[in-house]
Amino acid sequence: MNKVILGIVITLIVSILLNFDMNVEANTKKCSQNPYVTTDIIQSQKLSSLNTETGSNSEMVGIAPSERENDKYQSMTQLEDETTEGVDWKKSIRNTGKEILIVAPHGGNIEQGTTELTKALADKGNYDYFSFEAIRPKNNSELHVTSRNYNDLMLNSMIQNRKATISIHGAKGNEKIVYIGGPRSDLRNEIEKELVSRGFNVMVPPDNLSGKDDENFINREKGNTGIQLELTYALRKSFFTNNDVRTKNRSYQYNWTHEMYEFLDALYNSIHNIYPNT
């Protein structure tokens, strides 16, 4: 009798274990077939591990617009009064009176990749440049000041007596797109032609990224051709190995990709074609 009962108990236990294994396998299969489960987990890990430099989820996942409506600081004057140079930000400047000026107004860890592209283009063409660079360990997006409120005294003085000013920005977007803004000009047309010929996706910018506002610093000096380039987050990521836009990876040129150099050459050739003697 005891043996019969024992046999029944063993049979029940085995049955329960088999059903448990089948349920686990089925649930695992469902998860593996559901892209949202995997994406959510990966996205969560990325935000927690990579987001220390921007201090906000927006830039890291490419949903931060270049022209923010609610900047913490309403001018560069206010920003500089309430923050500390060398701790929160720094400026990199070359001002030798060249006729072409390249600008990264939201460089460093605000719109990653714009400083590197700005300096590389300036070095290639021996142009002057201005780069404002956020260097905080976090909360760098707070240091964004929109272009129409960008009253940096040094930059305003540097814009004088130039043939062209090219301002390089980062925009939102999970597709690799460059928006070309600023008043229509020969240089703008040439940049568009060069980029398209190299396979880049060039699009007309939305109004908030158009660079046509009279108060935008690229338009303040009449006679100075102003160009505003807005590079999506996806495009800027592609400029660096493993799509890694953290400071350490961006800092070394051996981490720059072929796509970065193609974009750089397109800009340089455009400037040289329109202004061959600069």
Residue ranges: model-predicted function:
Residues 4-22:
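Sec-dependent N-terminal signal peptides of Gram-positive bacterial secreted proteins and lipoproteins
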Residues 27, 31-278:
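N-terminal catalytic or cofactor-binding beta/alpha core of small enzyme domains
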